Amino acid sequence: MTMVTRVIMTDDDSQSLCFLCFLLFFFITAIAVAGDSLDSDREVLLSLKSYLESRNPQNRGLYTEWKMENQDVVCQWPGIICTPQRSRVTGINLTDSTISGPLFKNFSALTELTYLDLSRNTIEGEIPDDLSRCHNLKHLNLSHNILEGELSLPGLSNLEVLDLSLNRITGDIQSSFPLFCNSLVVANLSTNNFTGRIDDIFNGCRNLKYVDFSSNRFSGEVWTGFGRLVEFSVADNHLSGNISASMFRGNCTLQMLDLSGNAFGGEFPGQVSNCQNLNVLNLWGNKFTGNIPAEIGSISSLKGLYLGNNTFSRDIPETLLNLTNLVFLDLSRNKFGGDIQEIFGRFTQVKYLVLHANSYVGGINSSNILKLPNLSRLDLGYNNFSGQLPTEISQIQSLKFLILAYNNFSGDIPQEYGNMPGLQALDLSFNKLTGSIPASFGKLTSLLWLMLANNSLSGEIPREIGNCTSLLWFNVANNQLSGRFHPELTRMGSNPSPTFEVNRQNKDKIIAGSGECLAMKRWIPAEFPPFNFVYAILTKKSCRSLWDHVLKGYGLFPVCSAGSTVRTLKISAYLQLSGNKFSGEIPASISQMDRLSTLHLGFNEFEGKLPPEIGQLPLAFLNLTRNNFSGEIPQEIGNLKCLQNLDLSFNNFSGNFPTSLNDLNELSKFNISYNPFISGAIPTTGQVATFDKDSFLGNPLLRFPSFFNQSGNNTRKISNQVLGNRPRTLLLIWISLALALAFIACLVVSGIVLMVVKASREAEIDLLDGSKTRHDMTSSSGGSSPWLSGKIKVIRLDKSTFTYADILKATSNFSEERVVGRGGYGTVYRGVLPDGREVAVKKLQREGTEAEKEFRAEMEVLSANAFGDWAHPNLVRLYGWCLDGSEKILVHEYMGGGSLEELITDKTKLQWKKRIDIATDVARGLVFLHHECYPSIVHRDVKASNVLLDKHGNARVTDFGLARLLNVGDSHVSTVIAGTIGYVAPEYGQTWQATTRGDVYSYGVLTMELATGRRAVDGGEECLVEWARRVMTGNMTAKGSPITLSGTKPGNGAEQMTELLKIGVKCTADHPQARPNMKEVLAMLVKISGKAELFNGLSSQGYIEM
């Protein structure tokens, strides 16, 4: 009998079963989720590290410090960002980490990844599909790489910031871009090779605010909805069509619109006036016609109006005069013709007026532009102006850049042009000017450029030009100038630092495409190294940044120091005197022109011996062709280790062929032809042997290597036509010598053994760009002095001389008796140099890769920002440094006033007025580091012990051992723990990023210490920051408690110290963006200082009591 059991389930049983199933599902899910933990994230990061190290065996970045430790350490790895609970990895920042090769293909395993920054590397290949599986990614920056292929990121629907600029990505994005733009706020695809249409790809991107699609190959019409964005740039594409009124609806939110460099046409609509927040309107380089819209005059916020290179009507609307905030007006290349319009003389608010290439004729006085009171740059080049140069220009005392080149001006240059003390660039080239160069130009001490080429100027270069200590770029080629090159002229360009400092203070924001490209192309000698490198990369965007670099004194390219192949980024000068009638000898003092990288003296009548001191210059280009130089070619030319172009042809040099030329390993162009008295053998190996026979023509006494095809070469008749104006008798002597040499050679040719001159290859060039992990010597703007061993060299940043032996003597061989301080990065010794200067010698104690990075970072700061011979008054001056293996030494100015840390709690020695002065001094130093250095510098350890006082009590910031250059934004991934307990910003422990805002936080703590006389951390229940916030938030100061003042007069200084404490509280806000920047802080301090002046006659013993 078979029993069948039937189970009947009630409703309660069903619910219980469902609940059990839910628990089972939850348990399985929990197990799966548990697999995604910090442990698994660590394994992915270690896999990423191995991947990167295998493809970058030499130049490794921050990832080398990712070590196998417990899981908590993962969140402290440099470049790694975790959740606040440190439970998962959410971000990776490996910008500028010398990464090359294809992109890692397993980022998606980091399931909580929201931030990925791999910018400024050399990552190549296509963007892998794996990246599309990082579904939580919000910030992706792959800019400044060499990525290729097409763009496909369909899975990144949460992406808010996308930066793929400066790559080689191709293809049409019309179908791919809308798939991931739903949450996108920032989209930067500039400077790639994208193609196709973009007129409808943004319609579904509801959150988009900032778009930069410039410098691609997009075609068709523009997207009509750009009016709802904040910034929109499609500059330098192939877009066309008309810009319609409907694109500027009433709710236009644009602040920047850049349509330049396309083929838009028709009339531009006046409805642009609906964009009342517009700061920049750039229509340069299109095909717009008709009248300039009068409605533009109602956009009161407009600062930059770029309408050049179109065909607008020459009638300028009167309404534009209402733009009271207008700084830059560009109406160049519109072919206006006729006389210059009178209205330009009424733009009294404008600083930059660019009107070049408009086919203007007549004079320029009629428009009254020479009476504009605020004019800083006036560009009237490439027109047809004629007549005398107007003397009235000299009355514009604000003028810095005057460009009148490529016109038909004639007559003398007015002496009055020497009365513009702020003038930095004067370009009068390619006119019909006659007469002499005014001696009054010697008063132009701010002059950086003087361009007088291709005129008919005569006479000597006035000795007074040597007083132009900022004059780095001097071009008088192709005139009729004569006379000697006087020794006094070698002083030109000897100290441009004051001019660069003025430019660093100028904060006018000028966008790309405002005439600087044309200026740079005129002023950079495109055919001569090293400037040809810069000329080759001039695009509209690069011109803006390069122009800014030049004006502020930052180097555009690495320049060699004399006698070394080691390069550093520093400003470089040129001297162009070719095509004149200069005569006499070159003075030995030319060695003083220590920034000179290009020297062109060709096609003149210089004579005598070439001074050996020329070998002390950092030259990359030297052209002496077609002069009358004689004597031996100095062996010292072999010290020009980075010389690329050398032309000594058509002179009267004699003696043996200089073997030192074979040491010029970078020489790419060489010509020593037609110096018939040079003798000896041409090297058969080395750099010189790489040139063909055309480099040696007309030298019958030279012995050629066997591999030269000499048929008739060294016995060739030399005609008068080739030799120019050489005397006929001298010609006969040359031919006789050539024939005699040929006869002797036939008799002894079987016994001659060609000499082999081996080239001693110099060490591999170090460009200070992170391409090496170690280098024996790095140079800056000074010279080098060898120690007794000849290996350790001291690099001096001022003009004084001292050696490593002097350092040893000053510190008694680094004796313990000379120790005046110890820190986390080394020991400081006090000593006296032979010239009597007291110095503080800092010997770095850390070794290995990290110590090397720290030292190199500091050297980059020194090279780029000149903390030596010209030092900021609130930064401790550095006299020099040396590096040889483990020896890493800095030689600082000794500060006799000691450390602020020793005085900050002493309420009798440090009075309240002095405390405000110290706070102001430190702020000025940090303003320089953050806002006036390029790139910006983060100190990373602002504290009382890093503030030193000189003998007058002035404060200076010291210890840049961990300084880093910031290439993008204001953050930099730290490689070691930076900062000191009590001073470190709270976000540092989460982001591991050292930022300028972090410096502001540390500075805020320092101001609290100054205001209270209390330490940041003193063992109390409340740290200083917490106490200050409580006090200031509760407004307890208004009741006089708990803050009171000690001293005989309790009221003195209370208000100022309270204000100082308020600044400290503002600087220590929890959120970085809520903190002021250092410029804003300095402005607050200046106000307090102004109030403090009212108390100068009273007792100043006022301090806050706890």
Curated annotation (Swiss-Prot):
Each LRR repeat, start to end: 86-109, 110-134, 136-156, 157-182, 184-204, 205-226, 227-250, 252-275, 276-299, 300-323, 325-346, 348-371, 372-396, 398-419, 420-443, 445-468, 470-492, 566-593, 594-617, 619-640, 641-664, 666-690
Keyword flag Secreted: no
EC number(s) per entry: 2.7.11.1
Membrane topology: Single-pass type I membrane protein
Family of the protein in this entry: Belongs to the protein kinase superfamily. Ser/Thr protein kinase family.
PANTHER family: LRR RECEPTOR-LIKE SERINE/THREONINE-PROTEIN KINASE-RELATED, OS06G0585982 PROTEIN
Entry protein name: Probable LRR receptor-like serine/threonine-protein kinase At1g74360
